[in-house]
Regions:
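Intracellular juxtamembrane helix-capping segments at the cytosolic ends
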Residues: 125-138, 324-338
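Helix-to-loop junctions at the C-terminal end of transmembrane segments
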Residues: 72-85, 272-285, 366-367
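Conserved MFS/SLC helix-loop-helix module at the cytosolic interface between two early adjacent transmembrane helices
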Residues: 71-107
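C-terminal transmembrane helical hairpin of 12-TM major facilitator-type secondary transporters
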Residues: 283-330
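Extracytoplasmic gate region of multi-pass secondary transporters
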Residues: 41, 221-263, 267
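Helix-loop-helix hairpin linking two adjacent transmembrane segments in secondary transporters
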Residues: 137, 146-197
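A late C-terminal transmembrane helix in Major Facilitator Superfamily
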Residues: 337-371, 379
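Cytoplasmic helix-loop-helix junction between adjacent transmembrane helices
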Residues: 115-149
């Protein structure tokens, strides 16, 4: 007889979101939702070079994109069970297209902040619809590993091509890239299921010896705590990702070297998605997540002490690998709790709100002449808070619903 920890947790019924076409449509839609966030270091650097804004103003611009991402995600979480998901994705794509075109029309700070905010809203709609649809699958770790593997490959290409585009056309070339990327995705949307039929977050434990055991309901405070942890972790992401390129330049490291490390860091992180899927089947999702956050705290502390070519390269490789690794498990935990996508749709909101405020906070630290070491200390503290929250959540799941606590 299996113990409840050894039971499998499954949803009931046939799942249209597990079909290959539905997964492909959601993943491709995710390109438009995550492109700016993943390419933020080079985009910020290009804006600085082309438009000559201060560090604080660059933080405001980065926050505009991420603030829009937050709003788009919140809107999606309210609408995802009420409105055709294809319509949500299409509206988001049209916003991305129009707002990126508008970004090419004015070099002034306020108009550019407004257009970047609108682009962020569109990206948030796309990203949240993507995550909500993938959350409807019955194999969360595997599905999100595939999703993030494809995104990392795409973003490695972005890090390769952006310096070339920037060198020829400046920051406007990058805005046009995002515009052109969104157009063909419109034709993939019909593959996505329109609605999720199951309206509850009920799951059932399947005992391998005796069949169905019991229905489990996860208390709502646990997924909300998970979203808080996502927010805290993305304070790290927003501050580090917005200023890591600037931090290297400040100590005399060439932009070509930094761009190369960023590209290879993305390639290296591909192995993290495969490892995450394997570890999830072997150890569940919470234990690898907690370990990865411990490593991330240490990485940020190393960079807080000293920034040079060696520590910068180490931090970029470590950050790139564990960022993707952590995201697989954060999304997977929420998907196990709620297949309707309501909480998963709020993940981009948590990410976007954190990335909206993090560059501004980091910019303020720099404006007070505290240096990039202070920014890295902020990153370490944010990762530590997320670590503490997930330790608590894992403990509560072991007590309340152990079948989910160590589920893959």
């Amino acid at each position: 007889m299996k113990t409840i920890n050894e039971n499998r947790v499954e949803t009931l019924g046939t799942n249209r979101f597990d079909k290959p076409g539905a997964i492909v449509a959601a993943i491709v839609l995710g390109f438009a939702g995550t492109g700016v966030a993943m390419g933020l270091p080079l985009l910020v650097g290009s804006i600085a070079t082309s438009l000559h804004f201060t560090d604080l103003q660059l933080g405001w611009l980065a926050s505009s994109d991420m603030g829009g991402l937050f709003l788009g995600s919140v809107l999606t979480s309210f609408l995802i069970t009420r409105i055709n998901r294809r319509y949500l994705g299409a509206f988001g794509l049209f916003l991305v297209i129009l707002a990126n075109y508008a970004s090419t029309q004015s070099p002034e700070l306020i108009p550019l902040m407004l257009s970047r905010f609108c682009a962020g809203v569109g990206a948030g709609l796309c990203y949240a619809t993507c995550t909500a649809s993938l959350a409807g699958t019955n194999h969360a770790a595997r599905t999100f590993s595939i999703f993030l593997f494809v995104l990392v490959a795409m973003n490695a290409f972005i890090f390769y091509i952006f310096p070339i585009i920037d060198g020829k056309w400046g920051v406007n070339g990058l805005f046009i890239f995002y515009l052109l990327e969104a157009i063909p995705i419109l034709f993939i949307l019909p593959l996505m299921p329109k609605y999720y039929d199951e309206e509850t977050d009920k799951v059932v434990t399947i005992n391998e010896d005796s069949g169905p055991d019991t229905h489990l309901h996860v208390p709502s405070f646990l997924p909300r705590l998970c979203l808080t942890a996502v927010f805290s972790f993305y304070i790290l992401v927003g501050a580090y990702w917005a200023y890591v390129e600037r931090a290297g330049v400040a100590v005399g490291i060439s932009t070509d070297f930094i761009s190369g490390i960023l590209t290879w860091g993305q390639v290296f992180s591909l192995s993290g998605t495969a490892l995450a899927a394997w570890l999830a089947k072997r150890y569940g999702q919470s234990k690898p997540l907690i370990f990865a956050l411990c490593v991330m705290v240490g990485t940020m502390l190393v960079l807080a002490v000293s920034i040079d070519r060696t520590t910068l390269a180490f931090s970029i490789f470590s950050f790139s690998f564990f960022w993707i690794f952590i995201d697989v498990f954060q999304l997977g935990v929420l998907s196990n709790i709620d297949h309707s996508g309501h909480y998963a749709a709020l993940v981009p909101a948590s990410q976007g709100s954190a990335q909206a405020v993090a560059p501004t906070i980091a910019g303020m630290l720099l404006s007070y002449q505290l240096g990039y070491g202070a920014v890295m200390m902020l990153c370490a503290a944010a990762a530590a808070v997320a670590l503490i929250i997930y330790l608590f959540v894992y403990r509560q799941l072991l007590i309340l619903v152990p079948g989910i606590a160590d589920s893959d």
